[in-house]
Amino acid sequence: MRHPLEYQRRLGRALAYMARHLHREVTLHEVAAEACFSPYHFHRLFVALTGETVAGHQRRLRLERAIQQLILEPQRPIGEIASELGFSTSQNFAKSFRLFYGHSPSSIRACGDFTRVDQLLRQHG
């Protein structure tokens, strides 16, 4: 396949698939199949075009969604958010969150709005 638009269309299908499945971890094989590529070729293409692995991209999407939920649903238990986003435990979620953002989910929630979250994350990053 030599047509860039076809690559874009197929990559778009893979990205949409990942976004629809934030509630669980998806495998490289699943996402590659959705885009009609071999896992090897898809991995190379995905990293070249996005700068991320499939697992890294999905983790980032899940953690970005977590920030939205922490701010928009301040009364919702963090463990419930973690479970909905496919993390096996709230401790696993908190560890992933802290490694990615440099802050705990509760400290992000305490910011209260997206502007303050952005300021806090810029200090870290």
Model-based region annotation:
Residues G12-H29, L49-E84, C111-G125:
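Terminal helix-turn-helix DNA-binding modules in bacterial transcription factors
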Residues P4, P39, P74-P77:
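Proline-rich intrinsically disordered, low-complexity coils
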Residues M1-R2, R13, E25-L61, A82-S104:
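Basic/polar phosphate-binding segments, predominantly the helix-turn-helix DNA-binding elements
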